[in-house]
Amino acid sequence: MVVCAILACPAAFAAVQDKQQSKGDAPKISEGEQKAIEKINAASGVAEKLKAAAEYVKKNSKSQMRPRVAAYVSDQIAKVTDHNQRIGFVENFTKTFNLPEEADLIKPTLIDSLIGSNKFEEAFNEGSKHIERKPDDVIVLTQVAWAGANQARAQQQPNQPPPAALLKNASAAGAKAVEMLEADKKPEGMDAAFWGNFRNSWLPRLYQAQGVILYFSNDKTGAKDKLEKAAGLDPYDPPTLLMLSDILNTEYTKLGERYQAERKQALLNEALQKMDELIDWLARAAAATEGNAQYEKLNKDIMDQLKNYYAYRHEGKTDGLKELIQKYKKP
């Protein structure tokens, strides 16, 4: 069985910064500056807004309105759906808005697009540099853990684990992000509704990422624990269920081999119990992948394996298997 399909991103990190803007009264500005801001607002498309913003900054670099203009333009970039185009806009943005706090403003959007473009190593490196300066940035901590887990999966080689530093740093970022999400530590100034949605959608994915990292660190027991937590929060996610099925299959196979070598009744009982657990996870995985074109081949493999195990435990019959799978279908 394939260990892990590419981890699916449940929600983009984009448009975080607009949730952190100050809502205070705007400072008084000159008529010329007001017109420059209106030109940015009226500009059609992000490219034109960036041009107008560059003109604005040239003449108003010290203005108290600069942070708001930067936040507005950053938000417009975050709404762009084409990741390669968005990365180009981010590069353009940082040429105009070159203050450290302005770079921080656009950083989650850049990392989000790198992840969305499967440039996991670049995303991981960008995020790692950022959290050296801002260690409590839960958005970027989450991104680093997610990018690290995907990079670990992409770099897997037979008998050769991913780089230890990658696993260590991704694990640390994931652990801190989980701690903050579990404790409901909403960042100061972040919109409560945005935080709630972010927390609910990303907590199971962070547990999944931790499971992937532990899996490739050769800690299958720890990986299973994290993946079970992820499944408890989101019981319909195919990658989580596929990895759990893979881990359970390995556990069952090892018990079966031990029984064949030692022929002890206790080992047989343990192996059969493990098979029943595996059947349950395979049924969940079958339910989650059925009808999904991305997992068509995997679903067939799962069903073949599931039918064999189920029949073995039910006197060669598969009566009731459809009902078992149906039980785990998403409502």
Residue map of PLM features:
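Short solvent-exposed coil/turn linkers within tandem alpha-helical repeat scaffolds
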Residues: 59-68, 95-105, 132-139, 182-201, ...
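The tetratricopeptide repeat
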Residues: 35, 68-72, 105-106, 140, ...
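Structural register within alpha-helical repeat arrays
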Residues: 36-39, 72-76, 110, 144, ...
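N-terminal leader/linker segments that initiate helical-solenoid repeat arrays
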Residues: 12-88, 96-106
